[in-house]
Regions:
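Short beta-strand element of the alpha/beta-hydrolase
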Residues: 1-6
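Conserved acidic catalytic loop of the alpha/beta-hydrolase fold
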Residues: 57, 67-84
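Conserved alpha/beta-hydrolase fold motif
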Residues: 85-87, 110
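Gly/Ala-rich beta-loop-alpha elbow adjacent to hydrolase catalytic centers
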Residues: 88-97
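Hydrolase active-site cap/lid region
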Residues: 99-143, 197
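The feature captures the conserved acid-bearing segment of alpha/beta-hydrolase catalytic domains
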Residues: 122-188
Length: 228
């Protein structure tokens, strides 16, 4: 299981806990460190917001680097003989791993927790994009000008190379960054079998445990210690 963290993640503690849980289910787990996070940021910074900023070219280049890192790693796992490779991503991490799945079929299962799938909405309408759109507007850049350039960077405009039965999406009913209506539209477009909502907002820690437990229910055979 490849775990892809969210934007501005500060601690590895919670992720290590869930990797240990995966080990108990018979899975290996690894946490990908995205650009400008953990060992990939300046030691003088507590965290870095450089992944997403008003400089949209830089934002897209950072996303591309994240996706290529994932691509290289998953291909490496396949070459050494991993029989089943799954991906779990939350928020920005879910955006990244969804982009990988739009052109690569290495992953067999995909778990997305409050994923950022409609990038245009995130930038121009969500609370998270307030400062970005303020600066873009100051530069005279409009939504109609940015939309065409998101074609290769927005999961809502593509489709993963997985069957719908192999995708699990978990969202928050009060999430204003990845709202239910967007996830419901994605469910229809991607023909996703497993979509669940809980009464929480964005980046609620309880959804991590809920997502893994739902995966255990949805794909019981794949998480069985005896399936080998």
């Amino acid at each position: 299981m490849i775990i892809v963290h969210g934007l501005l993640s500060l601690s590895l503690k919670g992720y290590k806990k869930w990797i240990h849980w995966l080990n108990e289910q018979g899975w290996n787990g690894v946490l990908m460190h995205l650009p400008y996070h953990f060992q990939r940021k300046s030691p003088s910074l507590l965290f870095s917001a450089r992944c997403v900023q008003p400089n949209l070219v830089h934002t897209m280049e950072t996303l591309r680097q994240s996706v290529m890192d994932l691509y290289t790693f998953t291909r490496g796992l396949r070459r050494v003989g991993s029989p089943l490779i799954a991906g779990w991503g939350i928020s920005y991490g879910a955006w990244t791993i969804s982009q990988l799945c739009s052109f690569d079929d290495t992953l067999h299962k995909l778990i997305l927790v409050e994923p950022l799938l409609h990038v245009h909405y995130v930038i121009w309408q969500s609370p998270a994009g307030k400062e970005i759109r303020k600066k873009l507007t100051r530069l005279g850049i409009t939504p109609s000008e940015t939309y065409p350039h998101l074609r290769l960077a927005c999961p809502s405009l593509s489709k993963p190379k997985l069957d719908g039965q192999d995708i699990l999406i978990v969202g928050g009913l009060y999430d204003k960054i990845s709202p239910p209506w967007i996830l419901k539209e994605i469910k229809e477009k991607w023909k996703v079998d497993h979509l669940f909502f809980f009464p929480v907002g964005h980046l609620n820690n309880t959804l991590t445990s809920k997502s893994f437990k739902l995966a255990l229910e949805c794909w019981k055979d794949d998480f069985s210690l005896s399936h080998d």
